[in-house]
A protein has these predicted regions:
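Surface-exposed, low-hydrophobicity beta-strand/loop segments enriched in small/polar/acidic residues
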Residues: 1-192
Length: 192
């Protein structure tokens, strides 16, 4: 039972795309040298007008291009190519590349910050933004369970519940499967 709060951000698990096959494919998108915010595995990221990605810090609205699942850069300390689950804030390197699951139809596992009943299925929710874990390199973002509503501008929609030995509908910190509801940058008619 999900009786302990252990949010891990958005974990891409599947897709609603016509192919029906989730491959975990990522797009490589640059991060600006010296960008001042850490980005953790499972954080939402957005494109900005410099042609790079930044952490999307929205809660009731997001404009995501996808989910950050790691990065690569030449370490300014060692001079070695570094692969990491986390982008360390203010890293100065000219070759920083984020790995982003950018499928607008991706399904993601997330934990709620409170219990969600079966009646939450099909409704929309906001995001709770929290600083990531530097010890494990994971996002600590969660679904805002108190925001469940039909509001069409909320960024995520509950598609399913994670049902298993450690998770069930209505648990104190319910694990859910969500999709982007509104705001994905590939669906917007205006540019960045």
């Amino acid at each position: 039972m999900a009786t302990t709060a252990t949010p891990m951000g958005a974990e891409p698990t599947d897709t609603l795309s016509a192919s029906g096959s989730f491959t975990g494919k990522v797009r490589h998108i640059k991060v600006a040298s010296g960008y001042g915010t850490a980005i953790f595995y499972g954080d939402f990221v957005k494109l900005v007008n410099t042609g790079t990605v930044e952490k999307d810090t929205g809660t009731t609205t997001l404009t995501p291009v996808g989910v950050f699942v790691g990065c690569a850069f030449t370490s300014p300390t060692t001079g070695e190519l570094t692969f990491s689950q986390t982008f360390p804030a203010s890293t100065a390197a000219s070759d920083i590349v984020a790995y982003v699951v950018d499928d607008p139809n991706v399904l993601m596992r997330m934990q709620s910050d409170e219990a969600i009943a079966q009646t939450g299925l099909g409704n929309n929710v906001a995001v709770v933004q929290t600083a990531g874990s530097t010890s494990i390199g994971r996002s600590k973002n969660a679904v805002d369970g108190s925001s469940i509503n039909t509001t069409n501008t909320l960024p995520l929609r509950i598609i399913d519940f994670v049902d298993g030995p450690n998770s069930a509908v209505g648990d104190a910190f319910t694990d859910v499967i969500v999709k982007f509801n509104a705001g994905h940058q590939y669906s917007n008619t205006t540019g960045v």
